[in-house]
């Protein structure tokens, strides 16, 4: 701005100088033309005037010497022209009278020049002022620019801080979600611990009450022992008096026989004396009978005390189970040796003594059955006191009718109590087994009596040897009955079933076997194995036995109470019979009777009709029309080759041949597996669950069942037109989930449960529909329908390392530019699958040959080259072994039993273990079962007592106790 103003000012001044110079030159003009006119003739002379003025100015400035020197340098011609010109008198055509006009004009121009100079000075001042303002404005502009830059920097910092805050917010939200999950898990654990503590507190209170009762019973026992000791002393004195009286009676009888002929009067006196002595003996016998009643009462009290004492001893023996068991058994043995030997040997011999003892038994027996489950079960574990009683020195014989009636009364009481206890809900099976032990023990106590010695008196009835029980009698009945006894106990331990559980038929059969153990073992085994002869039973015993059989007849509710499988006949169908509605309620249960009868017969001996019906059950009934004439028996299928199946039966489908071969192998194997129970209809529903319903037609045509899923190969899937890599991996992980859950039919989760406590093990069981529900719960409902038919389920999400968030986002069709949505999906996906699965997926992504899993990737079948054509058969065999899901996947975790909470590792007895128990010898099996039963009761007691009962119970497996008992046998 300033430079432009300066230029304008300089141009104006130059113009003014030119105007002034032009006005001076007009004095020499003739006034005809204006000097400013472009056609003026003075434009060339104006220059000459300027040159002359310049010359004058220069000459005035020069000195004389310089002037002389300059003049010498001027050419002569130039000097002559100048002199001639200067001496000319012409006025250049101007009249002398026009000089005033030019003078006025010159004055006016001078005035204009001065005014212009003033204007120029004013303009200069204005220009300077404007320059100052311009400088101020430029300074303000710089300040505003600096402020703008500072504001932009602050804006950038604010954007960076906001981005970091957003990231921190997402991290905090993820942390809050983790904390919520942890809080839910902790809350669940707290509730579990509270429930466990509440149960434990009640059990501890019950144990304390039992201890108080034991202390009270201990005091009563001491009193009873004192009474028993005094009663024994009195009994000994009475026996001595009785011996003396017997000897005296014998002596008097001998004298009476010798002197009857000669001494008639003395005979009469002696008869009177004998009558008096007989009356005295009768009074002694009445007193003896009263003592016997007291002894029987003491014996009943001691038996109840022993039943109450044994569980307390087991509960107090927490530090050493074996010591507690030995202590309880030694106490019972000591009581039997000290208190029961003389009692059983001093049983009354009069006929009237049977009914009072039975009445006393009937009055005291109901009190025995008011004990708890543990109290009722433990006495059956202890060694019977029969051997100890027989080892003592008996003094009095036992009347047969009395002992038999007493045993029958006890048997009836045991059976009646067993019937009343069978209506319980949670402990029915345990009570049945315990009542069985009581029944057997009381029967042995009532019937197995010791023989008398040589000091028996003649007035007492003679000994009947037939009622002496053999030492080798099996207290658990036959081997089959014992196995059912063991199975009942193991089923009690293994599950939480109640008496109303769906397994009805087996429960009834088990109940009847338990009830009839005493009868079957005595009727079949005792007659052949007892070394002592059996006397014919009395009429009273026959009545009692018929009463027992009548009682068992009332208990028989269905045909499952039959004990001999050969005697079972197929009943004809009738409506309204027992268990008419059991089939629909059992769900997955099969026809137990038919399956058992089929398994009893080898498949090679099956008839043609059985084989055909079996093929129809397998879904291969379409081949019966062409191959029915070829099938003779089961042996035909067992010996058939691939060519025979294809030629004779017309099975062209390779999967049908494989299905038949696997089914035949399963029939030949003794192992019972759950995948053999899943038919092809279940597999089609399973395809819906894992999100692959498009293959239902192919799987249904191939009759793919659970066994074929377990042994499914890659070639099998390719033959079923499954060529997608993603679908192969989906089926692979779905089979692995089935193995982990032991091929349970309903292991997959189709509906949401508790969203706050989801674990990766539960996510493994999610179906495709459940995954879509999860997407809706995390605000991705608009993308959830894209998973239909994709094969995405919980097992694929958790177990497959190649399946990650990127694959999930591609399957959901989330665009790559929606980074917030993908980040949101990644956050919830990682929270869902857990840290371990995240680590596996991260390791898989770091591998050098990692390729992102997509829905378009295809499985390339292996091709055989001509170089390997010679080993074609070998190659086919090796390729056939390439399973979709390798056998090692899911086996380790699949062996664990389901149905228990985490942390409760309870070992269940399998069928092989029970069959192994059945194959034991009689004596060894009895001892081992008693040991296992006692060990199980000990473990249950410790579970109820200790705070960490679940972990301790896992450490004390019943199998270890059986092994210890085997080593001690």
From Swiss-Prot:
Primary subcellular site in the record, as a coarse category: cytoplasm
GO biological process, one term: cortical microtubule organization
Cross-link entry Glycyl lysine isopeptide (Lys-Gly) (interchain with G-Cter in SUMO2), positions: 440
Residues modified to Phosphoserine: 37, 40, 403, 435, 500, 538, 560, 595, 753, 757, 957, 959, 961
Entry comment, domain topic: The N-terminal coiled coil regions mediate homodimerization preferentially and heterodimerization type beta/beta. The C-terminal, non-coiled coil regions mediate heterodimerization type beta/alpha and interaction with S100A4.
Subunit structure: Forms homodimers and heterodimers. Interacts with S100A4 in a Ca(2+)-dependent mode. Part of a cortical microtubule stabilization complex (CMSC) composed of KANK1, PPFIA1, PPFIBP1, ERC1/ELKS, PHLDB2/LL5beta, CLASPs, KIF21A and possibly additional interactors; within CMSCs KANK1 and PHLDB2/LL5beta seem to be the core components for recruiting microtubule-binding proteins KIF21A and CLASPs, whereas PPFIA1, PPFIBP1 and ERC1/ELKS serve as scaffolds for protein clustering. Interacts with KANK1 (via CC1 domain, residues 244-339).
Protein name (record): Liprin-beta-1
Organism: Mus musculus
Name of the encoding gene: Ppfibp1
